Design a protein with these regions (language model features):
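A conserved beta-strand/loop element that lines the FAD pocket in flavoprotein oxidoreductases
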Residues: 70-85, 202-212
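Conserved beta-strand-loop-beta-strand element in the redox core of flavoprotein oxidoreductases
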Residues: 84-98, 216-231
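Beta1-alpha1 glycine-rich phosphate/pyrophosphate-binding loop at the start
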Residues: 2-73, 165-186
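FAD-site-proximal beta/loop scaffold in flavoenzymes
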Residues: 121-146, 223-225, 231-297, 301-304
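Short hydrophobic core segments
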Residues: 8, 98-110, 232-242, 299
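Mid-to-C-terminal Rossmann-like scaffold of FAD/NAD(P)H-dependent oxidoreductases
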Residues: 2-4, 10, 23, 281-374
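Glycine-rich dinucleotide-binding loop and its adjacent helix/turn
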Residues: 107-169
């Protein structure tokens, strides 16, 4: 029997690829090896569940067993690949050796935690990047038996979405970040200020321009010490300080990697024959776009390639929809040199148009009522990868 197509990972990228492949070939042997539960869930829902008090089982569309049965694959959950031998086309899982025919690395990205977490508070400090993480944080909230005081460290996409969601769920939220406005990578300052104001108006304690100095245990609470002398009291702390592609396994196997991920071409091929990368771990022709539409486009292109039709992926001008109902936000960050932001609108209903030196639109950011312009502006903006 031929060695199977093997995927490391079972998130949206991996399962999206398998579904695309099964449309082309129902019988090809496929094995999925994943460090987590292997349940099928939509990752974007992780930052919308607490407002509705959704238990983890409500987020999972199918269990790992159901996924394996539906897609006709071998699923190995809670299993870590320890080494890849590209020359022999073999994987190691501890002492176990598994041959593969072709390999797809879809290990995603891991939360970046840029500070030490003292052991005394470790059980009360969380990151949420997958369903297992959600399970842990949900259990901690439920164990309190009352609305929690949650301090979120980080005001990027993940931090802002969870701040909105937890606040909507009745929890007392503090948001801490060194930047002066929320979503600094997506929104220019006037729009970021509008989002910060919307958070503050909703009762979120917004602490921007502040550095975390220390976390310390104070009885059953966590004291979050800031550089202005404040000590915020929290039942739980959620760290949302960015993501880093999980490249260690690939790097150890000799694949070309960078801080942006495993380097692959537009056919998702790595520097080693027979090995591909997909999703948040992949840097495609110099671009790592950790959002759903690029992931889906990559899965579709790679499925065609693996089925015998080499296909290059293209990314359109796909805006990012931020899940902050307190103030809807949409952004298409410019990926070409920016000359200026041109601001339109008033109050919290703002449009910021990114222009190059020749006045051409190269990106945009929208808040409030202006988000309705996203389709019109996306049509006028340049594609991310063509």
């Amino acid at each position: 029997m031929d060695a199977p197509l093997t995927l490391i990972g079972s998130g949206m990228a991996a399962l999206g690829l398998v579904r695309q492949l099964r449309e082309r070939d129902a019988r090809r042997p496929i094995t999925l090896i994943t460090a987590d539960s292997g349940d099928d869930y939509s990752k974007p829902l992780l930052s919308t569940g607490f407002a509705k008090r959704l238990p983890p089982e409500r987020l999972a569309a199918r269990s790992a067993l159901e996924v394996a049965d539906q897609l006709g694959v071998v699923m190995r959950p809670h299993t870590r690949v320890t080494a890849i031998d590209p020359a022999a086309r073999r994987l190691s899982i501890g002492a176990e050796i598994l041959p593969y025919g072709e390999l797809v690395i879809a290990t995603g990205a891991a939360p970046r935690v840029p500070f030490a977490i003292p052991e005394a508070v470790a059980t009360r400090v969380f990151t949420i990047n997958d369903l297992d993480d959600y399970r842990g944080f949900y259990a901690a909230l439920e164990a309190l038996g009352r609305p929690a005081r949650v301090t979120i460290i980080g005001a990027g996409l993940v931090g802002c979405e969870f701040a909105n969601d937890l606040s909507a769920g009745g929890h007392r939220v503090s948001l801490v970040a060194p930047e002066t406005t929320p979503l600094p990578r997506l929104l220019p300052e006037p729009l970021g200020r509008a989002l910060g104001n919307a958070f503050a108006d909703a009762g979120i304690d917004v602490n921007l321009g502040r550095q975390l100095e220390a976390l310390a245990a104070e009885g059953s609470q966590v004291a979050v010490h800031l550089d202005d002398g404040q000590a915020l009291e929290a039942d739980l702390v959620l760290v949302a300080t960015g993501l880093a592609p999980r490249t260690a396994l690939a790097a150890a196997a000799g694949l070309a990697v960078s801080d942006a991920g495993i380097r692959v071409d537009r056919q998702l091929r790595s520097s080693q024959p027979g090995i591909y990368a997909l999703g948040d771990v992949a840097c495609v022709a110099g671009v790592n776009a950790m959002y759903v539409q690029p992931l889906q486009a990559s899965a579709k292109a790679l499925a065609a390639t693996l089925a015998g039709t080499p296909t290059e992926v293209s990314y359109g001008a796909w805006p990012i929809l931020v899940k902050t109902p307190l103030l809807p936000c949409v952004a298409l960050p410019p990926h070409r040199p920016l000359a200026r932001w041109r601001l339109e609108g008033e109050g919290a209903d703002l449009a910021a148009l990114a222009e190059d030196e020749d006045g051409r639109l190269i990106g945009f950011a929208l808040t409030g009522a202006c988000v309705r312009r996203k389709v019109e502006l996306a049509r006028a903006a340049p594609a991310l990868l063509v």
